Amino acid sequence: MSVNRSSIKSLLMVFMIVSSSLLAPVGGAAADEFRTPAASDTSPEAGECSNLDDFIMFLSVGRINADSCSRQAYVDAAVQDMKDSDANQTKVDIYSAAAGVKGGSETWAAPYDNYLNDTESIAWMKAESAIAQSYSEGESKTEAKVAAKAAIADYYATKQKNLIEQWNFANAQMFTLREQARMEDGISRNYVEPAYRNVEKTNSPDYSLAYSNTTVEKSLVDGTTVNTTGVSMDVTVQHTTVSDVATVSSGPVRAGKYNNQYNEWKATYYSWSVEPASPSQDTLYAVHFQPYADRWQRIVDMNGALQSEADNFVNATWDDYDTGQINASDVLSANTAMSEYGVRSGSESEGLWRSTAALSMMGYDTPNLNNSGMMTVEYKNVQHTGLLMAKNAPNGSWQVNTTYNTSNIDGPVFMATTEGTKLDFADGEEFTIVGMTAKDGTAVNSTQTTKYRYKTANTTELLEVQNQLIELRQEIEDREPEAGGFFGSGSTDTMLVGLLALAGVLLLAQSNNRGGRR
C-alpha cells in the first residue's frame, strides 16, 4: 500500500506547530485561565480517560488532561484507591481490636467482682494471724492493733494494684489504637477518643479538644503509692487550656471551662469510644470509667470496715490474753487455722491437710482426722497424734526426727489432736516430731507449711512493646512513597519538548532520505 509521505510530513509539521504554541509562555489573564481550569471544567476523573481524552493530552503534550490521563494520573488514582482501601481496613482492624479490649475487660471484671465478695473472710484471717503472732511475741495491745490493721491493708492494697494494672492495660490499648488511627491517612483524627456528654456551652465557643496519656500517683490503703495511667482531657477555650484527668478511682470527669460567661465549653467524659467502621455498626464504648471507680471505692470501704473490726477484736481479747486466760492461738478461728496454719504433703493436695485442721479445731471425732493422715509429736515426754500447725515453720516445712524450739518460730505453734483438742506449746519449749504418715498410712519424712503469695499483674513489658509498635508504624507511614506530578515540573516539560523535537527531526530526516531514493 502506498503512503502519501507528503501528507505525513504535513501532519507532523502541524503537530509540531500546535505543540510549540501550547508550550509557549502565556501571559496575562490568558495565562491564569490556561493554568487554572474554571469551576465548570469537564476534565475526566483522574485515571478514567477515554481514548479521545488520551489523544488530546498527547497532542497538548500534557498541558490538557494531564491531571487525569497521564501515566502518573493513573498511578496517583491507583495509590489513592489503595490508601482508601487501606484506611477502611484499618478502621475495621481498630474497631475489632477495641471490641476485644471491651470483651477482655468484661471477662476480667466478672471473676474480679466475685472475688471481692469473698475477700472479707480472707482479710480477716490475715488479721487474726497477725494478732496471734503479736500476742505470742509479747507485743502491746496497741502493737497488736497496728499489726492487724497492717495485715488487712496489705491484703487489700494487692487488690488495688491488680485493679490498677487492668486499668493501665485497657487505657494503653486504647491510646495505641488512637495513635494508629491518627497515623493512617483517610481516617478521622478523632476516630478513637474519650466520649463526652452533658455539654455546657455559651454562644458558639471557639474551643479545641486534645487527649494525652499521663502518669498519676495513687495512694493505696496500706499507705504506699504507685504510678498509674491517667487520661488527660485538655480543653482549650479562648486560648486558655484547662486539663482534667480521669484515673482508676475518678469515674467520669467534667472537663473544660464554664462559668456562664462568653465563649465557654464543658462536658463530662465517661468512656473510650470508637466510631463505627461501617454504616451497619454503632459507636463502640470500650472502656467505661465508672466501674473502675466503683471497684476502687469498694476496696477502700471493705478495708475501712475490717480495720474497725480489728480494733474491736483486740479490745475484746487483750485482757484475757494479758491475764493468761487464753493463749495466743486461741484468737484463731477454725477457718483461720485451716487456711493459715495448715500443712500439706508433697504428694497430697492442700485441701486434705486444711480439712484435717478444720475438722480437729471444730471438735469432730477422731475417725475423720485419722483418715486424713497424722503427725506424732513428743512434747514434755508425752507423745501426741494429730496435726501440727504454725504460721511460720522453720524453712517452710516440718521434718521427722527433728526437735524444734518455739522461741525460734515466729507466731504461735499448736497441735490439733486426734482427741479433738488443741495442744499449745509454750514459748521457749521444745517438741520433737517422731513420725508422720500420709492418708494411706505410709510414712513420710517431711511436709510443707501452707504459703500464699498474692500476685499482681505486670503489664509493663506489654506496654513497652505497644510503644515500640507505635514508633515502628510511624516509621512505616513516614516511608510510604507519595505520588508526585509527572507533567508538573519545568524540567519534565523541557525533556518532553526535546523528545518531541528529536522525534520530528528523525521523521523528517527519514522522509528526506526516502525522498532521495525516489
From Swiss-Prot:
Q: Spell out the protein name for this chain.
A: Envelope protein
Localization, UniProt: Virion membrane
Q: Describe its function.
A: Envelope protein that may play a role in host-cell attachment and viral genome entry.
User: Which keywords fit this entry according to its UniProt record?
Assistant: Glycoprotein, Membrane, Signal, Transmembrane, Transmembrane helix, Virion
* Membrane protein topology class: Single-pass type I membrane protein
Transmembrane portions of the chain: 486-506
Residues with attached carbohydrate: 213
What spans does the record annotate as topological domain Cytoplasmic, numbered to this chain?
Answer: 507-518
PTM: N-glycosylated by a pentasaccharide comprising glucose, glucuronic acid and a terminal 5-N-formyl-legionaminic acid residue.
Signal peptide annotation: 1-31
A single GO cellular-component term from the record reads: virion membrane
This protein's record includes keyword Glycoprotein: yes
Extracellular topological domain residue ranges: 32-485
Instruction: Look up and give the organism this protein is from.
Output: Halorubrum pleomorphic virus 1 (HRPV-1)
